[in-house]
Amino acid sequence: MLSQCLSRTSRAVAGSNGHRFSKLSAIDGVHHAHPSPRRYTTFSSSDHADRTKRLLDAKEKAGLTYDKLASKLGITNTYAAQILLGQTKLSAATAAKLQAALPISEQDIEDMKSTYPMRGFDDEILKEPNVYRTYEAITHYGEAIKSIINEQCGDGIMSAIDFYCDVGTTTGVNGEKRVVITFNGKFLPHIEQKEEDNTAKSPRD
């Protein structure tokens, strides 16, 4: 009976967040599911993780901060971090600069240039306090931000595709270090769906 219950629980959890679970273990009498790497037809999270570790080790070996690496690559510091974390595709032009800046294998460079990344995130990351507080700030101020965007730009959204993000610091009035995050996204207005502009009308039986 217990094994059947655990089996049902494991399937339910796996279905809720996209993970597959390889086994269940008991800690203090409570059974915990251990996620196995996600697998996609063109993407392996274990390969991704191995490459990311090599890239971060190379960054540390080179003694570069993200700001210094970004300066060498001519990109924002968050985009430099995304490249190393496998959250964006590496362009040919930036690949040459990256290889000059860090001791990276030719195979890793080619894989980063040819792989279309899975840009989603594991829900587990929201348990990290730094990440969650950023998420909390955006959700807390979300309605106010939307209202101001609408007031200043009209009915639409800020793109996260035609988009720049930069992280920096400043000094507060009491001498404390403060974090500054800048989002610079293209405004995309919602369109009025006029029939004459619809080039792909659905068929009618």
Swiss-Prot record:
GO BP term, example: cyanate metabolic process
Catalysed conversion reaction: cyanate + hydrogencarbonate + 3 H(+) = NH4(+) + 2 CO2
Cross-referenced SUPFAM superfamilies: Cyanase C-terminal domain (SSF55234), lambda repressor-like DNA-binding domains (SSF47413)
Active-site feature positions: 133, 136, 159
Source domain of life: Eukaryota
EC number, as in UniProt: 4.2.1.104
Keywords assigned: Lyase
A GO molecular function held by the record: DNA binding
Family: Belongs to the cyanase family.
HAMAP family for the chain: Cyanate_hydrat
Function of the protein: Catalyzes the reaction of cyanate with bicarbonate to produce ammonia and carbon dioxide.
Full protein name: Cyanate hydratase
Organism placement in taxonomy: Eukaryota, Sar, Stramenopiles, Ochrophyta, Bacillariophyta
Gene (UniProt): CYN
